[in-house]
């Protein structure tokens, strides 16, 4: 069956699912394979649970004569081709977003701002890979007049694959930093991979990028593209400055031809979120959202999922940034915490994963920076930090840290919690 015919079937379905445990009535189930599972084996269950059709790529799982089964050569490729075909049919303007740090927060901020005057489809959570991007595109409906599609990468070529599926009309790279070094091989590999967004947009005649003018790496690879620039310099499309950060980020912004600044009080923690917020201002303004609506949207946005969240417990004030960590974001968080006005500071930091051959060196740099900042009350969690030279308390895993917190609970402290999601630092919150 060709993709046009599959698309016609898709249009009769209520939604698309790849999880046989979650099959809404009338949905299309697509059987994917992984290292430890074969979705084909669950196609029958999906149909019993509510799916109207099931796409499988092993004929043995499709009973002869049952028209609810659609047999294809490769289910994953079919998912991606179907998403691309649907995207072309909808013709919705798409803003593609990638970057090492801040892309999910920026996506949320952009979508919040744009939703003031537009019907916006945007990536849910961080479904930003070769499966998540197609699933996002397949949620496009005629009533959507804009889409914000987040794209993640952990290996060279990942962004190239995703932009060819999504075919964005606009692009933004939040920044480039040291993450997934194990997959990319080097910092240069990261720049090249993130730059695949720009490479694709150069092939589109009317394409536009939104660029943080203060970032030299982005400026270097943005040649030959129509640019809408934002940053700290005068004369840019949007110009802005941080005005406060204790603990919430406050900033001002104005357009290139305005003389008066707009002041925004956010619920975001950290100066490192300023470029993310300014990107949302820029894109909102570009798409016709009024300044007052932009300011209101940003002021009302509350971060979720352990991303720079402020939480007050009965005993302490917590800054929870335990969703992910890499050398760039870790340095930014520590630097911001250093400059924050607060007494009795404590840091709980977890290992940074997927750094490959650079891992030992990058963890040592963080330990050295903590010493340089003069922090005394620090708990380092994980085997990678344990192997560094430092004068701090070290724990092999979060279980050991929790045992210590149960013996002696900190009180009256402002505590930064930062580490890779796999370290599970979010589980310490209830003990603080």
Language-model regions, residue ranges each:
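Residue-level signal for inorganic ion chemistry
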Residues: 27, 46, 82, 97, ...
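ATP-dependent carboxylate/acyl-activation modules
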Residues: 97, 305-307, 422, 426-428
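Active-site beta-alpha connecting loops in nucleotide-dependent enzymes
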Residues: 34-37, 303-306, 323-393, 420
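Mobile, glycine- and charge-enriched loop segments
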Residues: 20-31, 120, 131, 135-147, ...
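Acidic, Mg2+-coordinating active-site environments of NTP-dependent enzymes
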Residues: 60-65, 172-317, 342-343, 368-377, ...
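N-terminal leader/targeting and accessory segments in enzymes
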Residues: 1-81, 85, 340-342, 367-382, ...
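Phosphate-binding loop of NTP-binding sites
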Residues: 77-209, 213, 217-226, 260, ...
């Amino acid at each position: 069956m060709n993709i046009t015919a599959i698309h016609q079937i898709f249009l009769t379905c209520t939604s698309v699912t790849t999880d046989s445990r979650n099959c809404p009535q009338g949905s299309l189930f697509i059987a994917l394979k992984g290292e430890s599972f074969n979705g084909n084996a669950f196609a029958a269950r999906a149909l019993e649970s509510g799916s109207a059709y099931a796409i499988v790529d092993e004929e043995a799982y499709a009973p002869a004569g049952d028209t609810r089964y659609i047999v294809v050569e490769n289910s994953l490729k079919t998912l991606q081709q179907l998403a691309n075909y649907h995207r072309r049919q909808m013709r919705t303007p798409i803003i593609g977003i990638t970057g090492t740090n801040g892309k999910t927060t920026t996506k949320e901020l952009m979508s919040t701002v744009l939703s003031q005057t537009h019907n916006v489809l945007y990536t849910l959570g961080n479904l930003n890979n070769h499966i998540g991007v197609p699933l996002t595109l397949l949620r496009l409906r005629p009533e959507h007049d804009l889409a914000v599609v987040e794209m993640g990468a952990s290996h060279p070529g990942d962004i190239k694959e995703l932009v060819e599926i999504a075919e964005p009309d606009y692009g933004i790279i939040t920044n480039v930093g040291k993450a997934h070094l194990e997959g990319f091989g080097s910092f240069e590999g990261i720049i090249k991979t993130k730059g695949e967004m720009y490479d694709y947009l150069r092939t589109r005649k009317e394409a536009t990028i939104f660029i943080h003018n203060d970032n030299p790496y982005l400026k270097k690879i943005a040649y030959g593209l129509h640019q809408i620039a934002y940053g700290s310099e005068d004369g840019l499309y949007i110009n802005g400055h941080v005005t406060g950060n204790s603990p919430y980020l406050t900033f001002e912004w104005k357009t290139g031809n305005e003389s008066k600044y707009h002041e925004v009080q956010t619920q975001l923690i950290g100066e490192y979120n300023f470029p993310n917020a300014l990107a949302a201002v820029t894109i909102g303004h570009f798409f016709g959202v009024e300044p007052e609506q932009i300011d209101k949207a940003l002021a009302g946005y509350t971060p979720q999922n352990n991303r720079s969240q402020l939480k007050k417990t009965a005993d302490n004030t917590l800054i929870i940034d335990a969703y992910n960590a890499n050398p760039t974001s870790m340095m930014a968080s520590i630097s911001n915490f250093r400059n924050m006005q607060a007494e009795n500071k404590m840091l709980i930091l977890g290992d940074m994963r997927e750094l490959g051959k650079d891992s030992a060196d990058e963890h040592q740099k963080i330990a050295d920076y903590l010493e340089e900042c003069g922090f005394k009350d620090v708990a380092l969690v994980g085997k990678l930090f344990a192997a560094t030279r430092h004068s701090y308390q070290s724990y092999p895993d979060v279980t050991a840290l929790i045992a210590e917190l149960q013996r002696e609970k900190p009180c009256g402290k402002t505590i930064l919690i930062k580490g890779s999601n796999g370290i599970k630092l979010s589980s310490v919150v209830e003990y603080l």
